[in-house]
Every structure is written in C-alpha cells, then in structure tokens.
C-alpha cells in the first residue's frame, strides 16, 4: 500500500489539477522519548498496574533502550522507511498530535482528510484518530494496515471509530483504497 501511495502521490504531484485532491503527503510517526526521559510523564513511565516483569520505557531491551529516540529499536523498519519529502514525527505520547508539529504541517498543506494506519490499533492509531477528529480532520482508518497484539482490542477499536455514524471517522481497507486510486488515475 505504501509503495502504491508513493507512486500515486508522485503522479498527482506531476498533474497540477490532481494535486489538490490527491495523496499529498505521507507522514511517518513513531513514539519515542529523549534519552534523559525529561519528556516522559511519571505515570506513563511507572505503569502502576503492570506486572513487575513488564519492561518499562527507558529500560534495556534487545535493540537498545525501549522507546528511546536514537536507539536501534526506535528506528522505522527498512520496508517502511521514509523517502525524501516524507516527514517523520517523533512523538512523546500515544497520539501523533500531542507535543508535535503535525497539526501545523497538515494545515500548511491544506490537508483535511487523513488515511491512518499503524500499530497498535487501540493505542497509537486510535488516539491519533481521536486527536485528529478533535481538530477537525476527517479520518479513514485502513483496517488491514493496522495491527494489535490482541485481536479483540483491534476489533473493538474499529467499532468505536465507526459507532454512532462514524463518531471519529470511517474504516476502509487497502483493497478499496488501491481500487479508488486506480479509478481516479
């Protein structure tokens, strides 16, 4: 899906008429904190309800300190790594708008609709969609491009987005997106 979106965005960039309504910007986000943890709230760090064996942010993991910017485990995997012109938003919270310049980036581009995908559905994806909705963006979650450790959490998060006629947005999938992109080209 990412490769198809990149191809379509390039095609739209070359056609001024389609540029306005096409896929204009691919933004990557990742949750991470400063090495000194000054941007980490104590309640998030301590997780009082977690079992004592739970690794917490900043502790050593198999790929460096967990959720610390600059550590190998914090980087985006090669298959999804941003290309030139695709910004990376480093976020200290679960949502992509909290303590970031995402809203300013989207507004500067005149973007009003967001296609949202990622992990985990019930935490980062869901929080981002709620934050976006509060700021007036229309969100479409690509369900098959999202994931969770728990299928029932994923399913519940999807139902919550579309409840009450789409209280936070709508849900689609990559097949429908790719078909729509093909149809409009």
Residue ranges and their predicted role:
Residues 7-11, 21, 33-34, 39-185:
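Active-site-adjacent betaalpha module
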Residues 1-25:
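A short, N-terminal amphipathic alpha-helix
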Residues 29:
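SDR active-site strand-loop-helix element
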């Amino acid at each position: 899906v990412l490769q198809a979106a990149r191809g379509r965005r390039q095609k739209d960039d070359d056609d001024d008429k389609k540029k306005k309504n096409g896929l204009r910007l691919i933004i990557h986000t990742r949750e991470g904190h400063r090495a000194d943890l000054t941007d980490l709230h104590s309640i998030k760090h301590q997780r009082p309800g977690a079992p004592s064996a739970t690794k917490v942010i900043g502790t050593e993991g198999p790929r460096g300190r967990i959720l610390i910017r600059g550590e190998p485990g914090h980087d985006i995997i090669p298959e999804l790594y941003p290309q030139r012109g695709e910004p990376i938003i480093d976020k200290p919270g679960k949502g992509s708008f909290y303590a970031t310049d995402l809203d300013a980036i989207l507004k500067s581009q005149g973007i009003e609709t967001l296609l949202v995908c990622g992990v985990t559905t019930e935490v980062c994806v869901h929080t981002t969609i709620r934050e976006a909705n509060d700021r007036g963006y229309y969100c479409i979650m690509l369900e098959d491009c999202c994931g969770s450790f728990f299928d029932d959490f994923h399913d519940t998060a999807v139902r919550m987005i579309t409840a009450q006629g789409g209280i936070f947005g709508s849900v689609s999938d990559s097949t429908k997106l790719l078909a729509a992109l093909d149809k409009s080209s």
